[in-house]
Amino acid sequence: MLLLALPVFPFVGCEPRTDNGSSVEPISLYEKIGGVWNLSDMRQIDETAKAAGLSVTEVNLYAQFEFPSLVIDLTTEGNQPTTYQVSGTAPELFPNAGYWELNTPFPAADGTAPKILLFADAAKTAKIGELNIISVPGAVEAMELRLTRTADGVPFVSYIYKLVK
């Protein structure tokens, strides 16, 4: 009798469970990027000199001017972007307040860097700026943003913001 029951034991208590992720929302970039960020470094890159192959193309503005504070607050509500607010003593390079969203809520499969799009209105129809995310926060809560100024579509200066939570 015991020999007849042995082949059945491996199947008792087994319940087929497939973890396909359908019960959990995927982690979006909003979860990583939203929040209060403090400036830890700021560099200016002369894109014209860089394109011409000149040696002096980068200036560390943070060390040179010793900005006591710069805080960027990217507010989210229910994992959706709402407003942003910039405070501190660094020069204003983009509007200090408005609304924001990412050009994509998830990392791109082709490795394209996400962008923070800045808007003047809550409907997000009047775009007032764009920040390229060069370094997305992960295990280390640090992020790098690039703001590039152009003239007739040609970049002439970029600012790199290194931020920490």
Question: What do these predicted ranges mean?
Answer:
Residues 98-101:
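Short beta-strand-centered aromatic/proline hotspots
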